[in-house]
Curated annotation (Swiss-Prot):
SUPFAM superfamilies (alphabetical): alpha/beta-Hydrolases
Name of protein: 3-oxoadipate enol-lactonase 2
Gene: catD
EC number: 3.1.1.24
Enzyme class: hydrolase
Record organism: Acinetobacter baylyi (strain ATCC 33305 / BD413 / ADP1)
Family matches, as PANTHER family: BLL5160 PROTEIN, HYDROLASE, ALPHA/BETA FOLD FAMILY PROTEIN
Reactions the enzyme catalyzes: (4,5-dihydro-5-oxofuran-2-yl)-acetate + H2O = 3-oxoadipate + H(+)
InterPro entries cross-referenced by the UniProt entry: AB_hydrolase, AB_hydrolase_1, AB_hydrolase_fold, PcaD/CatD
Amino acid sequence: MPVFHFKDTLTAQDVALNYATFGQADRPALIFSNSLGTNLSMWQQQIAYFQDKYFVICYDTRGHGASSTPVGPYRIDQLGTDVIALLDHLQIPQATFCGISMGGLTGQWLAIHFPERFNQVIVANTAAKIGEAQAWQARAQLVREQGLTPIAQTAATRWFTPGFIEDSPEIVEKLSHDLAQGSAEGYASCCEALAEADVRPQLQRISIPVLVIAGAQDPVTTVADGQFLCEHIVHSTLEVLEASHISNVEQPQAFNHAVEAVMKRFN
């Protein structure tokens, strides 16, 4: 992973957010938001690619990585206002936001409620409503009772295609290990946020440009979910990558090129 330009912790609201920045602060800002059960290290291929061109910010979502784990359950508006607090802390009036899965749902909420803070939003492998509330509540209960090991043991098949699992075992093992070592309470509390989060009725309020990235083989948030977003967001485009759920890791070059195209267009 590239050497940190700066690493710190922001204490805001009820949470201490771990974050890192890369590149020169006077360049256009690009902030990345991780998926459920991962941390900011999932963006290392994006950091390496973009840090010489943009001011890159990565952070650990509350309850993940080195960020603190406030008492849950969490709500999607908390995940969103954590981002606004971080931008305020860094004195960044406007940025491009890129989030994957849970981070993509956070991005949709931000585009609805804080459009003035973003040039555009990139949402990858996500949906306006991810899964069913009952399933998320059941997963939260399972994790609180048994920890993250059972979830981590099966995560790879939800995250990646069989070919990637076979060809890149070190990457798969690293992400699975990070999940197993994470905070069970933080994971469960974010499951509860996902159980309640549903921005479908508000998508038509989004007026800023949105790039939707979907994985052709994603079993969690499907291409149809991405198409639904584009049908309801006025200034949106869909990019489908040959990947499963964690497309930025499985197809980093294609992912980076898709992000760079909108960065060049709207910055």
